[in-house]
Amino acid sequence: LLSVASAVADDLLPSADGQGISIAVEGSPANVYGVKRLLYEIVYNLCDNAIKYNRQGGSVKISTVSEGGFSTVTVSDTGIGIAPEYQNRIFERFFRVDKSHSKSSGGTGLGLSIVKHAVQYHHGKIELTSAPGNGTSITVSFPAIQ
C-alpha cells in the first residue's frame, strides 16, 4: 500500500499544488493480496476528494501501516468535513453532500461508491471520522499478508 500511496501522491501533486494544498505520504510497507489497479483507485479517489473538498493552504496526508493482522491506508485532510447526518451516505452512488461545490469541482458522484465496492472486493472495511470544519479521515483496512 505504501508504493500505491506514493504513486497516487505523485499523480495528484499537480492538482494539489494548483489549489495550494500539500500532499504527503508516510508510514511503513503494508502488503495485501489484491488487484493493484483497484487498490490504486481506492487511494486515488479518497485523495482526489480530500483535495477537492479542502481549503487553500490545506493538507492531505496518506498513511500506511500493517498491524494486528490488517494492512491499512488512511487519508486525512484539513478540508470542510462532513456533517454526521451525511456520513453514512457518502459511499452511495451519485450522493453528494454539497451539490453546489461539486458542480465547480467536477466529478460524477461515483468516486466513493467505487471505493466502497473495491474495498468490499478485497474483503476490507472502511472507517470514517469527520466533523464540519475539521476535515475528514478515512481509513481502509485489508487483511494483511501473513
Where are the language model's segments positioned?
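Conserved glycine-rich
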Residues: 123-124
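Conserved micro-motifs of the catalytic ATP-binding
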Residues: 27, 31-37
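Short conserved segments within the C-terminal catalytic ATPase subdomain
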Residues: 15-25
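A conserved beta-strand-to-alpha-helix junction within the catalytic ATP-binding
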Residues: 1-13, 64
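Short conserved segment of the HATPase_c
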Residues: 82-96, 116
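Short beta-strand/loop element within the Bergerat-fold HATPase_c
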Residues: 57-69
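Acidic ATP/Mg2+-coordinating residue in the GHKL
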Residues: 77
